[in-house]
Amino acid sequence: MASLKSIIRQGKQTRSDLKQLRKSGKVPAVVYGYGTKNVSVKVDEVEFIKVIREVCRNGVIELGVGSKTIKVMVADYQFDPLKNQITHIDFLAINMSEERTVEVPVQLVGEAVGAKEGGVVEQPLFNLEVTATPDNIPEAIEVDITELNINDSLTVADVKVTGDFKIENDSAESVVTVVAPTEEPTEEEIEAMEGEQQTEEPEVVGESKEDEEKTEE
């Protein structure tokens, strides 16, 4: 469990104040949830990035707020891609004994037999909904695809649960499949198709049979 310090923001802040705050390398944030009132704080952006890389998206953080330390998770955050900057964070104070349902990424492991034979690995499901207490939420769920041949697939029911958590997705939902490669047409087939297009005479729209007879005369 990683720790992060925050500083309480006093009073109401204007857009100009928040802009200046971000320019100084700080991120405005709010803390709310279990056992705490809503508190406006600020955290160092670089330190926050270090912590989130350590604990991952669903990890628990010990957040210092004033004289207290609160166990929180990142409920949400906003990111400005143009400035490459985190602009706001929502910290959710949590009860460590209370289960939560969150999205956990699926990580494919190994190289499928079918892929070695030219098949294509398709992954329709990139995240699984997982219910667990905060300290039992996995960083990722590994799915071994080594034994998959072409036209083989794995569903949610095939995913091995190796921790104290429950997967909430429909058991029949497809996680990964290996499909046959798309066959490219041969040169002979391409030439044949081009020949068919050239032999087809375009039909003149609006030309009647009577017009055709006059033309023949």
Curated annotation (Swiss-Prot):
InterPro entries: Rbsml_bL25/Gln-tRNA_synth_N (IPR020056), Ribosomal_bL25/Gln-tRNA_synth (IPR011035), Ribosomal_bL25_b-dom (IPR020057), Ribosomal_bL25_C (IPR037121), Ribosomal_bL25_long (IPR001021), Ribosomal_L25_dom (IPR029751), Ribosomal_uL5_bac-type (IPR020930). GO terms for molecular function: 5S rRNA binding; structural constituent of ribosome. CDD domains: Ribosomal_L25_TL5_CTC. Keywords: Ribonucleoprotein, Ribosomal protein, RNA-binding, rRNA-binding. GO terms for biological process: translation. Residues 184-205 have a biased composition (Acidic residues). This is one of the proteins that binds to the 5S RNA in the ribosome where it forms part of the central protuberance. Part of the 50S ribosomal subunit; part of the 5S rRNA/L5/L18/L25 subcomplex. Contacts the 5S rRNA. Binds to the 5S rRNA independently of L5 and L18. This is Large ribosomal subunit protein bL25.
